[in-house]
């Protein structure tokens, strides 16, 4: 198992900064690791690669085809914890990935950027 104290960590990104990146047209890969039921409650706007952590056995072998090292990867979850853990794991798989964690997750997005996104 990974030791979080010695594992590479994703860079932190605030909801406002992510909004600026998206508004400017920056080429990003958005990865949402929440469960299907969470997406039904509060979907993240735009094109997002949905990789629920509980279903990693279904997508893990396809991961190199789904993600590229040529664009930053922003990982999203509910509060920023699962996304950070996935980001740490992803960096351990391929240090060439440029991984960012949405601090505070979809909750922060709802509070700081888009209050129309439901909170749960």
Language-model segments: which ranges?
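Rhodanese-like catalytic fold shared by cysteine-dependent sulfurtransferases
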Residues: 2-29, 36-72, 81-120
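Short, surface-exposed ligand- or partner-binding patches at beta-edge/loop junctions that are enriched
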Residues: 76
